[in-house]
Amino acid sequence: MLAPLCTRCGAPTVWPVERCIECAGRRLAFASARAAVHYAGPAKAVVRAWKERGVRPLAALAADLVVAHVPRPAADVITYIPPDGDRSRRRGHQPAAGLARELALRWDLPAARLLTRVRRVGRQTGLPLEERRRNIRGAFGAVGRVHGTVVLVDDVYTTGATVTAASSALSAAGARAVHVVTFARTIR
């Protein structure tokens, strides 16, 4: 995504700001968030094909676009948003995990499964921001102690509710900082 961006959440802004209207006043558990592309048009079609139709090679394409548009965060490890078990079984793959593996190769970072779902969550699609936050709060737990700075990968940043909940779990487990990287971002 083209600058200027909010330094914190990565939302497009008219001029560079430390905290934009989207993240000002919110407690964000991550240090920064960046996305390669706007979630619209062709990017939306790519995500749908990748997630719902299982076109796994699109993870490599998405990783190439991320590397081209997102500076590599200074980090010790890369991880991903763990999928809902039912959706993962139905799809037969884990899109965020695939993107994390591809980025780990390109950024020469170790990839690790640092998070797990500790409770089931209803679908987030179509929910307003406050409902998304309530729905996802407390849904993630760390697999063990987390050391150093973490890159947290997901396919799409919509409201930040999912990555905030996951970042909270990583921080509670010892992460020094969490930098969120997604393929696409919804612009509100």
Identify the meaning behind each predicted range:
Residues 1-188:
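Glycine-rich phosphate/pyrophosphate-handling loop used in enzymes and phosphotransfer proteins
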